[in-house]
Amino acid sequence: MLDLAPLWISLRIATIATVVTFFVGIATAHFMHHYRGRGRALLDSIFLAPMVLPPTVLGFLLLILLGKNGPLGFLFTNAGISVVFTWYAAVITATVVALPLMYKTTLGAFEQIDSNLQQAARTLGASELTVFRRITLPLALPGLIAGATLAFARALGEFGATLMLAGNIPGRTQTLPMAIYFAVEGGDFREASIWTGVILTVALGGLVSVNRWQPQGRRLAKREGKKEDLMLVSAQENAQETDGPEKLERPDRLRHYASMLRPAHAPTLSVTLTKHLPNFTLDVSFSADEQPLGLLGGSGAGKSMILRCLAGIETPDAGRIVLNGRVLFDSEAGINVPICDRNIGILFQNYALFPHLTIAQNVAFGLHQKLPPEQIQEIVTQQLSAVHLEAFAERYPHELSGGQQQRVALARALASQPEVLLLDEPFSALDTHLRDQIERQLIDRLQDYQGVTLLVTHNLDEAYRVCHQLLVLDGGTTIAHGPKHNIFEHPQTVSVAQLTGCKNISPALTHGPNQIEARHWQCVLQTVEPVSSNLTQIGIRAHQINLQTYPQASSAPNTFPCWLATTSETPHGMTLYLKLHRPPTNERDYHLQAEVFKDKWSSLKDQPLPWTVYLDPLRLILLEAD
């Protein structure tokens, strides 16, 4: 009769080793995921060494370590514990050989998690333990299960190291691989075949189950999402465009909740920070109040870095951040409030919704867990109602469109009533029609929001419509800060003019108190404002150039003949490239860019050249050096 002892011994050893490996592997992977020291490569190699070393070499090293004269074996012997040639020696070898698989698989799962998800959880008030428990582990779960399965299969099949450390003692340390080996050695191929089939069934069965479980779960979620999409999405999107009483009443439902958390004094944010980056040094100082502040600048100017420093995701090298009288960061005093304690909400570019949580759970994530469940449910319902998504409460983020995800992210950020709301290019992933809708809804939400708002955007129109104040950055430094009207209508420097969309700029020379020469345009211009001694250039915006087809007296100020060099068409207008004084020699030979609507272009295009261009003195922008 077949002795089943090797099967039970193998299952017991592999199970215990897998349990130990599971927790040790997760802890090791979590440590290595955050460790960035110089010894990272060495530590990683040590953890992976059992996977590449020959089993006999590994067994010999363990024998030296745990033998009677070994450093650990000596301690065990003095304590009356003998490790070698016992069943728990087999557990040790199985754990050592299985650990690399669990560690590497788990580390890969951790590295695939979008770091913005963890940062979003921290900004919503979650501690590191909460982030690990509610975000990291659930998102890494498929990898953890795969790693545990591989570890179990490896522990079940361990032979060489186990033979050297635990020996082959029937009924005590003889595992399935050893039973197979000695059965073949004794000529009992029937027993060897049976045990081989058992190992194949157990090991491959577990791997197949894991491989089938993961895609099946994803397909199920997608199918259920698509079932309701046909009925709910179109109805919900249509409801957003209606202007009935329900739409007007929904924001009112939040007023009572918002009034309870309204600050006693007007919110204030004071920021002075310096951070050294690879290409430049971010050095800014500004303040903000309840009126939204827009951050404008080219790519890499430091706009998003400012938000990350405010939220606590990045640490400035020097500076001070004070919010409503509370110091969040002070390099001199050594103060750096953790992310979870800053009460700052941030809307990431990719929205950073937690994919394993429903929409309602996402919105409720930042609410204090000590609140009564009824109050949490009420707040979640109010927030989703305000963004017209209450019907989607039990759905998951991947079942929503980009615009719906953006609104959920905004509702989640506002649910806990943060003192500061940071918006990092919130409309960048939306199409034009949806962008306009979401922008209007954002403006409506901000009217009831009683905190400080900072908006990062590359879109000038967005910044102008949403924000009252603007902060213009170039190369990490502030080049303009003030009301949006002043910055757009009276930019002081060339960089500010260019960043606010001025396309016509020319070096200038002063000819008198109200007269300058535009050197590139080869003309003398009259100005309304007195010319400053610091004047270096002059500009005019493309849409403010006045074009006429009838000739005017050449003595009229700022009036010149012009010829059309080439055109560029947009959906609703035309950009005209104009050469002053004489016809152009080629398409690139032009002085000015003028933008006109297509109805204006229809009346211009058939008129004979030259046309007349008028540069209104009120529209001229007098610029100083940066």
Which sequence ranges carry the predicted segments?
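A short, proline-enriched helix->beta-strand linker immediately N-terminal to the Walker B motif
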Residues: 415-419
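Non-catalytic connector elements of ABC transporters
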Residues: 265, 271-317, 321-322, 326-327, ...
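Interhelical loop and adjacent transmembrane-helix boundary motif
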Residues: 1-5, 165-204, 208
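ABC ATPase "signature
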Residues: 478-482, 490
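Conserved ABC ATPase signature
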Residues: 396-400, 404
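ABC ATPase NBD coupling module
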Residues: 328-345, 369, 487, 491
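Conserved ABC ATPase "signature" region
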Residues: 127-129, 326-331, 374-392, 444
